[in-house]
Amino acid sequence: MAREFGRTERVADYLRQELARLLQMEVRDPRIGMVSVNEVEVSRDLAHAKVFVTFMERDSEKDASEALAVLNHAAGFLRTELSRDARMRTVPKLRFVYDAGVVRGRKISDLIERAVSED
């Protein structure tokens, strides 16, 4: 009988939760603002993790790219903080990616609401 969740999925879920906590509690850079960790994809060898984030107060691509640069610069600090937990022997190298799907979804939802209200 196969396991319901593989190791990479468990590690990805753990990283998503811990990174959300660390970004809220430990990172004090005002250039980031409020950030939401949407998803984490971990490579099969657990060496790399792609972290999909959105920013609550930044809708333009320029603002998001600046905040992404700050997050990618802080990736080493976050990786060190994650390594202090004894649950993982090695912590994947983190790479932050802007998740534009949430913003697109919000725009589509606004368009639908506007179309419905015009009828």
Locate predicted features.
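Charge-rich, low-complexity N-terminal segments
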Residues: 1-48, 54-119
